[in-house]
C-alpha cells in the first residue's frame, strides 16, 4: 500500500493577477493547487464553471477560504448568528467551485466561553451538511485563537477539524 502524497498549495494572499495567471504560476512552481479567499478579485472575475475549467486545464486543486465578520479581524458587532449566516452563504457559493477543501476563519475571541461553545456546536452541525471537508483555521481575533485551550476544545468538540495558522 502506498503512502498518501502531500499536496502543496500556493496561497493567493496578496496576488493581483488573474486566476489563469495564478494557475500558470502555481503549475510552473510545481504546486498542486491554489488556496484562495472566496471573495478574491481573481475569482470574482469568473463564473463558477470558468473557475473550475481554469483549474482543471492547469491540473490544479483548490482550497477555498471563507472569512466571516467583515474581514480577517472581525467586526465586534457581528453576532454569532450573523457569522453562521455568512458561513452558510459562503459554503453554498464555495460548493459550486468543487474545492478539495474549505477553510473557515470565523467567530470572535470577544465572545464568552459559553457563547463560543454554543457557536461551535451550531457551526459544526452546519458544516456536517456539506460533502466537502471543512476545517476551521486557528487565527488571531477568532474563536480558535488560543492554542493553550485547544486540547480542551477538541475534546469537547470531537468533530472539529483544524487548519493551523502558524503566523
What is the meaning of each model-derived region?
Residues 14-17, 41-46, 142-145, 157-159, ...:
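Short, exposed beta-strand "edge-strand" segments with a Pro/Gly-rich flavor and a Y/T-containing core
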Residues 1-89:
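N-terminal pre-domain/capping segments
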Residues 35, 63, 102-103, 163:
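Conserved beta-strand positions in the central sheet of alpha/beta enzyme cores
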Residues 166:
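Active-site metal-binding loops of divalent metal-dependent hydrolases
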Residues 76-162:
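Active-site acidic/histidine proton-transfer and metal-coordination neighborhood
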Amino acid at each position: 500500500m502506498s503512502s498518501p502524497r502531500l499536496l502543496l498549495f500556493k496561497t493567493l494572499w496578496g496576488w493581483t493577477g488573474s486566476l489563469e495567471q495564478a494557475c500558470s504560476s502555481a503549475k510552473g512552481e510545481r504546486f498542486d493547487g491554489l488556496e484562495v479567499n472566496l471573495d478574491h478579485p481573481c475569482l470574482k472575475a469568473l463564473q463558477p464553471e470558468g473557475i473550475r475549467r481554469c483549474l482543471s486545464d492547469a491540473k490544479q486543486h483548490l482550497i477555498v477560504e471563507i472569512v466571516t465578520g467583515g474581514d480577517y479581524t472581525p467586526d465586534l458587532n457581528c453576532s454569532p448568528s450573523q457569522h453562521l449566516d455568512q458561513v452558510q452563504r459562503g459554503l453554498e457559493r464555495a460548493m459550486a467551485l468543487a474545492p478539495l477543501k474549505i477553510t473557515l476563519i470565523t467567530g470572535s475571541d470577544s465572545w464568552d466561553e459559553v457563547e463560543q461553545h454554543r457557536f461551535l456546536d451550531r457551526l459544526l452541525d452546519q458544516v456536517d451538511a456539506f460533502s466537502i471537508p471543512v476545517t476551521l483555521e486557528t487565527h488571531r481575533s477568532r474563536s480558535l485563537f488560543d492554542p493553550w485551550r485547544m486540547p480542551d476544545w477538541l475534546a469537547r468538540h470531537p468533530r472539529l477539524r483544524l487548519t493551523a495558522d502558524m503566523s
